[in-house]
Amino acid sequence: MKKPTGVRLNNLLFSIFWWFIQKISPKNGEKLLYWGLQSGAFPNRFREDPRLATDILGFHLRTPIGVGAGFDKRVGVVDDLIFMGAGFGEFGPYTLEAEQPVTETFFMRRDKAIVVQSLGYKNTGLLNMVPAFINRRYLPNIVGVNIAITAEFEGENVKQGRVMTYEEEFAIMTRKIAPYCDFVTVNFSHPETELYRIVSDASMMVPILKNVKRAVAEAAPIQSPKIFVKIPLNVTPLELPLICSHLMTAGVDGVVVGGPLSLSQAKIKLSRKHYAGMLSGAPCKPFVLDMISKVYQFTKGKLPIIACGGVWSGEDAFECLAAGASLIQIGTVLRFEGPKAVTRINHELVTILKSKGFRSVSEAVGLDFK
């Protein structure tokens, strides 16, 4: 496991450093956070506990708490967070080529939330990131790569002067990255594009996922990374059973429930008014829990679920497990608290498991339906 090197801050210096990060702009704060993680400056208080360990899809994880996509697009800090207590991580999301949409980020500290106004995925492009994945391929950490596309018009995108179908684009990205990761997440969750509507259309979704499976088999027959699908929180009650049926038909390995929530569709009162954009953080929790429980029921517990969104405490994590999630991803809380959030949530989850007499987190999965 990768160990950061450098001078480690004591608790007092960390508190001062983190106070400073909170006072500067989100962009510069993120740069300092990344520097602290990469340099090994942050104190590491994580203590392993056998109750947290879990086995899923052939992976042995020391904790179900992982780092979600959106936190690390540079392949720079997820491995450091795994060293500091996360069980796994996910890079991205990446589009095939670089995208630099105009993006505004608002930290809603009173609401424990972030609002992002963007019509795409700001990233340097998967093609440009492949060398970074090659460089870290010998690390033992369990990591995934989140791949996405931004719809330019119905059914196809224009790339490098030619028309490329969604199936082709997802397959190309999968072939590029499959040899260097443990799982691939096909992301349909961007609420500010119509692309997420694909998930309820079997004629579009199933061929895409079967193409991705074929690409994995061709590019990484030995590693054979697992395939997850990230579905949006904004689907309707009528669409969700269809989506679950499509996922089972396509034969994917699991589903990621969550991601950002569209403010234009969610009736959430925030301390500051924002009429457009994508919301992440604590206010997403009720939506995530509701969808986890429904997906768990519709798939009869046969499809592993990763909860993504709204987790701020060990109690939140336990509620996700009880609703049917096997793993949990955090992201927004890391931007507010830094790496100590990983240690805190793990510790709180252990305390809850002890108090309820559980010997492992797996005993809590789907507890609401037992």
Regions found by a protein language model. Name each.
Residues M1-F46, A113-I114, G120, P131, ...:
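Alpha/beta catalytic cores of nucleotide-metabolism and tRNA/nucleoside-modifying enzymes
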Residues Y94-I142:
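A gly/proline- and charged-residue-enriched helix-loop-helix capping module
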